[in-house]
Amino acid sequence: MSKKLLIMAGGTGGHVFPAIAVAQELQKQGWQICWLGTKDRMEAELVPQYNIPIEFIQISGLKGKGVLALIKAPFTILKAVLQALNIIKKYRPDAVLGMGGYVSGPGGIAARLCNVPIVLHEQNAIAGLTNVWLAKIAKRVLQAFPTAFAKAETVGNPVRKDLSELLDPAQRFKARATAEPYPLNILVMGGSQGARIINQTIPEVAKALGNAIFIRHQAGKGNLRTISDVYKQADNVSVTEFIDDMAEAYNWADLVICRSGALTVCEIAAAGLPAIFVPYQHKDRQQYLNATYLANVGAAIIVEQPDFTAENLLNILQPLIKDRQKLTEMAIKAHTKATPKAAQRVAEVIIEVSK
């Protein structure tokens, strides 16, 4: 009989995509996968596209919800735990994988009450509150970066397989270095929601550098027309709302400018690319710490949001346009931090705890 895994992950791509990579690894080994999520977040639409059945509980964050939501919180959580209990009793998984998001809290409690072993994976350099608590009841704790937990196995972030199949950066960049002079290909990612500071600053840089660069700018949902208008039909820019084929985009790029979400950092390492990171400013400095994973080995440059001006960015880019060897060195350093077997290792741990 096939073994069963229940995945608890939701809210953002940083939680969902690594979990999908693990699911696919286990499906190849004959496992059945079911997903626990919420109806109003991205997993509701995304997960079924991978032919993975999904069950829903009602839970959301409390931030910004007001006093009434705080008063109702214990009852909301209890209701979500009971919903998760019913799903676990119906599905009877051999193990539960917690990958983060609000759904993981009630799901983790329900799994513990049903004596189902929990494997926890923290994607960020600093653990979220839900995972800090779940780590106390998990059978095994895994992490992408070595700083999240003092006692956990560091395995990296599972990333899409096609990134690991790209040519080694030394080969990729060598071919470009021997070609005729060409513009510096810059991949700009504002994230799925769009990063306003990036979307505002890059058009100024594109205008200043002209044909010395070519920009592919992923502007984020709802920003396509606005950003396109800002560029004013510049012939060194291509603007899209989303990028469907990330492997192709990374393969095209000489440099990436983006936020430093955990999955993005690990994808850039897997592809072997230099990066300029603009960490989202949050009180726990989560994205800044994610970025240091590559910056500390010389593979990336961190520019804090208040310093992300056109003038400062020009001062960084102009030397790189002239010194392509520097970009090659950064790309190779990034690739040394890749963890191509992360999904495989998470799958191995799940198999171990299910025995």
From Swiss-Prot:
Could you tell me the membrane topology recorded for this protein?
Peripheral membrane protein
List positions binding UDP-N-acetyl-alpha-D-glucosamine.
12-14, 124, 160, 192, 243, 262-267, 287
GO MF terms, alphabetically ordered = UDP-N-acetyl-D-glucosamine:N-acetylmuramoyl-L-alanyl-D-glutamyl-meso-2,6-diaminopimelyl-D-alanyl-D-alanine-diphosphoundecaprenol 4-beta-N-acetylglucosaminlytransferase activity; undecaprenyldiphospho-muramoylpentapeptide beta-N-acetylglucosaminyltransferase activity
Q: Which GO terms describe its biological process?
A: carbohydrate metabolic process; cell division; cell wall organization; lipid glycosylation; peptidoglycan biosynthetic process; regulation of cell shape
What is the catalytic activity of this protein? Answer: di-trans,octa-cis-undecaprenyl diphospho-N-acetyl-alpha-D-muramoyl-L-alanyl-D-glutamyl-meso-2,6-diaminopimeloyl-D-alanyl-D-alanine + UDP-N-acetyl-alpha-D-glucosamine = di-trans,octa-cis-undecaprenyl diphospho-[N-acetyl-alpha-D-glucosaminyl-(1->4)]-N-acetyl-alpha-D-muramoyl-L-alanyl-D-glutamyl-meso-2,6-diaminopimeloyl-D-alanyl-D-alanine + UDP + H(+)
> Per UniProt, which keywords does this protein have?
Cell cycle, Cell division, Cell inner membrane, Cell membrane, Cell shape, Cell wall biogenesis/degradation, Glycosyltransferase, Membrane, Peptidoglycan synthesis, Transferase
Q: Name one GO cellular component term.
A: plasma membrane
In terms of domain of life, where is this protein from?
Bacteria
Q: Which pathway is recorded for this entry?
A: Cell wall biogenesis; peptidoglycan biosynthesis
In terms of Pfam families, this protein maps to: Glyco_tran_28_C, Glyco_transf_28
Q: Where in the cell is it found?
A: Cell inner membrane
Q: What is its main location?
A: membrane
Q: Does the keyword Hydrolase apply?
A: no
| Enzyme Commission number(s) from the entry | 2.4.1.227
Q: Which family does it belong to?
A: Belongs to the glycosyltransferase 28 family. MurG subfamily.
What task does this protein carry out?
A: Cell wall formation. Catalyzes the transfer of a GlcNAc subunit on undecaprenyl-pyrophosphoryl-MurNAc-pentapeptide (lipid intermediate I) to form undecaprenyl-pyrophosphoryl-MurNAc-(pentapeptide)GlcNAc (lipid intermediate II).
Query: What is the name of the protein in this document?
Result: UDP-N-acetylglucosamine--N-acetylmuramyl-(pentapeptide) pyrophosphoryl-undecaprenol N-acetylglucosamine transferase
Query: To which species is this protein native?
Result: Haemophilus ducreyi (strain 35000HP / ATCC 700724)
